[in-house]
Amino acid sequence: MTQSVPLLLRAARGENVDRPPVWMMRQAGRYMKVYRDLRDKYPSFRERSENPDLSYEISMQPFRAFKPDGVILFSDILTPLPGMGIDFDIVESKGPLIKDPIRNESQIKTLRALSPSESCPFVGEVLKRLRDSVGNEAAVLGFVGAPWTLAAYVVEGKSSKNYAVIKAMAFQEPELLHKLLDHFADSIANYLCYQIDSGAQVVQMFDSWAGQLSPIDYETFAAPYQKKVIDLVKKTHPETPMILYISGSAGVLERMGRTGVDIVSLDWTVDMAEGCARLPQNVGIQGNVDPGLLFGSPESIRARIIDTVKKAKGRKFILNLGHGILPGTPEENARVFFEAGKSVNELISQT
């Protein structure tokens, strides 16, 4: 029976659905009071994301509050790094810090192949519990960072404004960078397969910093490794829909559609109608409401959702933001977003 399959999974597979499913990137997080209360009690981000009880609880907070159509694992794209021999910490308000940035070949040679069941079994445990808890009321989503973005963090050593260190490596020692990217592609594909085997029904790959590359360099340093991850996962899990997100992707949108991914997640700088026109019909679209709009009035949120959904008509489509929800967003406006998404057919019929 079709209805026993969650709406988001059916939509992601390209089946006909009554309405677009809706979820939000970073839907579990700082804008929610219950999350901030828990953060005060457990100030270490790594503890919150690596303790299975805490990760499960945080993943479930937005589901209990808003009943989105997707429940995404609360974790971090850097979570698999220690399993490869790269230690990191996440400092509140500063972001990730890599203990020993990767800058030479001897460091790359010492990297281990990732064994997720040994180095991050808590991820598998949380995904299993989420599947048990949400049943067919929502799809469970897993996620990873793409090779370029992981490399950007581990080479730079932290977040960066201009990515000068990794770009210097790219243009001075490209073979060195390719070795690192290739290592990450194999390990990340393995990690995604582990997440799917543990219960993830849809998975998203974040190449957050690939938008910092020119199109020609995207084709050299990002796209081939996105494609390698996708191909490796599809080899063993062909039925699992895969989503690709890049922040600032307007310049590489068509290239994203050629990676073999099932769904491209648009950021808000691309008009939904234009994004649909620029991607092949067989590639689904996710997005792409500006998260800043959630500081606006309920009327403006509803109007933008109507506009976005109308422009995506006829496409395989998942309603989402164009980036993660911002800290400080009023919780009531997040509720408006979810409720408007779920009742979008009625809202459109009233316009």
From Swiss-Prot:
Site note Transition state stabilizer, residues: D76
Origin: domain of life: Bacteria
GO biological process, one term: protoporphyrinogen IX biosynthetic process
Reactions listed under catalytic activity: uroporphyrinogen III + 4 H(+) = coproporphyrinogen III + 4 CO2
Recorded metabolic or biological pathway in which this protein acts: Porphyrin-containing compound metabolism; protoporphyrin-IX biosynthesis; coproporphyrinogen-III from 5-aminolevulinate: step 4/4
Keyword terms: Cytoplasm, Decarboxylase, Lyase, Porphyrin biosynthesis
Residues reported in the UniProt entry to bind substrate: R26, Q27, A28, G29, R30, D76, Y153, S208, H323
Pfam family name, one: URO-D
A molecular-function term among this protein's GO annotations: uroporphyrinogen decarboxylase activity
Segment forming the signal sequence: none
Entry EC number(s): 4.1.1.37
A Gene Ontology term for the protein's cellular component: cytoplasm
Family membership noted in the UniProt record: Belongs to the uroporphyrinogen decarboxylase family.
Subunit structure: Homodimer.
Name of protein: Uroporphyrinogen decarboxylase
Organism: Prochlorococcus marinus (strain MIT 9211)
Top-level taxonomy: Bacteria, Bacillati, Cyanobacteriota, Cyanophyceae, Synechococcales
